[in-house]
Amino acid sequence: MEEAHLLSAADVLRRFSVTAEGGLTLEQVTDARERYGPNELPTEEGKSLWELVVEQFEDLLVRILLLAALVSFVLAWFEEGEETTTAFVEPLVIMLILVANAIVGVWQERNAESAIEALKEYEPEMGKVIRSDRKGVQRIRARDIVPGDIVEVAVGDKVPADLRLIEIKSTTLRVDQSILTGESVSVTKHTDAIPDPRAVNQDKKNMLFSGTNIASGKALGVAVATGLHTELGKIRSQMAAVEPERTPLQRKLDEFGRQLSHAISVICVAVWVINIGHFADPAHGGSWLRGAVYYFKIAVALAVAAIPEGLPAVITTCLALGTRRMARKNAIVRSLPSVETLGCTSVICSDKTGTLTTNQMSVCRMFVVAEAEAGACRLHEFTISGTTYTPEGEVRQGEQLVRCGQFDGLVELATICALCNDSALDYNEAKGVYEKVGEATETALTCLVEKMNVFDTDLKGLSRVERAGACNSVIKQLMQKEFTLEFSRDRKSMSVYCTPTRADPKAQGSKMFVKGAPESVIERCSSVRVGSRTVPLSATSREHILAKIRDWGSGSHTLRCLALATRDTPPRKEDMQLDDCSQFVQYETGLTFVGCVGMLDPPRPEVAACITRCSRAGIRVVMITGDNKGTAVAICRRLGIFGDTEDVLGKAYTGREFDDLSPEQQRQACRTARCFARVEPAHKSRIVENLQSFNEITAMTGDGVNDAPALKKAEIGIAMGSGTAVAKSAAEMVLSDDNFASIVAAVEEGRAIYNNMKQFIRYLISSNVGEVVCIFLTAILGLPEALIPVQLLWVNLVTDGLPATALGFNPPDLDIMEKLPRNPREALISGWLFFRYLAIGVYVGLATVAAATWWFLYDAEGPQVTFHQLRNFLKCSEDNPLFAGIDCEVFESRFPTTMALSVLVTIEMCNALNSVSENQSLLRMPPWLNPWLLGAVVMSMALHFLILLVPPLPLIFQVTPLSGRQWGVVLQMSLPVILLDEALKYLSRHHVDEKKDLK
């Protein structure tokens, strides 16, 4: 039943044709079950393992590799002679890469689907209902509850369905619904109708929501929604409807794959077509078909050369290393690609409570009355330092440090705070922090008493555990709490009845200590405490006190104020009717006003500086909270989200104000707003959608079940470490310390990772360009193969893979958080950069072909043929006069391929050293700034020597050891690449970047 909160309890019962005493009949239960189904959330129908495996092969790069592997496998079957074994190495290695990538992909997908399943932990196993088939309350399985059932809940129970309250059987009913609404304190419920069709869940005080917990009290309610129709069920439906977006990096790699596939197709076809005239050469036995197959193999080698096979592994490694660095900064990343996405975050939508603030309610101001004569009223005002539950802080009057024991009013105020209180401080030795036991508001008062130390208790030498309650203990030794008159909605206050512990004739008698909403408490005060005297409360004094409280409760302060009072001569406890809560208000009249405290959930000290950093980095911070607008705007001003006098019109909205806007106005509001107050989870999702329509990359924080859909929808969902399992499962990142500063640190890390990723992607691609140029050139010129597929795989995966991974450790730029967020649609390689890496790649290809050609033409150990003979090597035969005196087998020697491979590897090592910085010279940013890179270069060269010297690797890779003279030629051809890149960097710094700055 929608909008049950609008109806009276009697109307709701009438709609379901049920009575609170009798409950549903078995017939009604059967009908309702058929109509509404079981009261449970359906299990997530995840993708089958086979579907997940198939998905991993939808990537274009992967499909090209798969095709290359299959073709290589077929060609390997037709190999003859000693190449029969080595021919299978290439397809097997490619298949291993694909299988490994698929396993990682499937594992990540399986992990990501757990968010919806985690919702089920909030479903209780059992429920208590009243039905006509049995007298009294009966326990049944929660899944069997149907709309119309009369359900009983009591303290400690998990609510089994959405209920409309019909009767509260205790003084009050308090419910912890933080998982659903994000409210940090438990909520007092009632049974009255709420005539507001647009009330948000926080305002539906006559409703209990499935999955929330009863904090205190006992009540009856009628089930108005079950299963997917509950608020929890709606969240499940929203989560199921959210399709995961591909990250900017994934989209870029997809685009890169498309471009690469087109380029590969064109080049492969071109190589094959250009050589049609050579298909019938003698080297192929005069068989046109054999010649066609030979050049087809070269085309396949080209495909293998063009694809950076090591790229997926290097990216995964770099992101994994990034997650480790982030974890040290309290940001635990669950989804690897989101590490890079953090780097282009342009908007951070942050919860207020616990993220921007400490979620540790603290008293920061208090006052007692200094003078209350007929026409004048003067107050003693104090400020208190400290923003956490740590019982340390200073009490000041103006700039002056004060000893609270010197003010009689403060001694009495501390006494009320300590005794009219059911909370305590506890020192958590494992975490090394003080924590609350009980309600946040009351814990703030407990902490205040410790800071005030009105009896000058000696606190030296106390352990932290003892320090947690030392000053409160002293007060509690003087008075004994007899009983508590619980808080109720009508009187907005609570009180305790205390008697002195010492039977001293001079000791004061029994007292009632009262705390509550200032207007309500002061209305029942007839006098005011001035020092140790009791003075009648005049209209002037009353108005002066209320004006001060109104000032604290609004504007830039926006404190939550509590009035503290006593009843000096209460009735005898024997004469009080404690079972009738309607009498409580009479016992709490004729009060003496003692003082007032103002508290707030204080901003985290480090957050203001982080918001300034975000502003400099071009990142907009938006506060989203369930709190009221006044409090939210005040906190925004304290944090620097708004200026002290800034007009917030059009920049701060409540959920209701946002709903009143047209869809286009909502879009524009999301573009300019920096504060959303009194919002529901659905608003968060709409805010994310609107921001995404402007191509903003949004980071959204959340901790409750209600936040899960928005966390899943945002590019970066950030859950709190103290949040629910559902939120953590839906998020890409979890903050172990719940601190906004950790988000900013993670964004900085994300930017650094992206910069490093650009370096190694470009490094790998320039290598691939070189390999393509090499094979293309040999095919066009009709030269013998300089590099074979298995060698290309070795270079792409191992030799290049190690330095590429080490580039992930490059130090970040010092001005990384001074730049605007990069455009997520900006290409990895474009314009000038494309030319740069093409130039390097062409040099790599030319040098590689030159090395192989040098051996044939000039090496003393080589055949020293002419270039014309080399170009026509396929026509070599004993009866061809062009090749008189030349052994045709020399054209299949391993020396030229070894020379080419050695030049390729050495140039790539020089390239890696060049990649420490995109534009800075090696003289400004030398390679030893990244010691990991130096280690990787040494390791890669060691592996290269390994395949040259250690059997059976030379056979597998078709290589042979080189002489010292040959290594000299390799270095002569390789080292100029450093000079070429330095020249290109110089042009970048002095011409290309300057033009960008002028623009």
Curated annotation (Swiss-Prot):
Record's CDD domains? P-type_ATPase_SERCA
Where are the Phosphothreonine modifications? T19, T415
Top-level taxon in the UniProt lineage: Eukaryota
Q: Name one GO molecular function term.
A: cysteine-type endopeptidase activator activity involved in apoptotic process
Spans annotated as Interaction with phospholamban 2:
788-808
Write down which residues bear the modification named N-acetylmethionine. M1
Q: What is the source species? A: Rattus norvegicus
Q: Which UniProt keywords are listed?
A: Acetylation, ATP-binding, Calcium, Calcium transport, Endoplasmic reticulum, Ion transport, Magnesium, Membrane, Metal-binding, Nucleotide-binding, Phosphoprotein, Sarcoplasmic reticulum, Translocase, Transmembrane, Transmembrane helix, Transport
Known cofactor(s):
Mg(2+)
Which tissues express it? Found in most tissues. Most abundant in large and small intestine, spleen and lung. Also detected in PC12 cells.
Under which name does UniProt file this protein? Sarcoplasmic/endoplasmic reticulum calcium ATPase 3
Q: Which residues form the active site?
A: D351
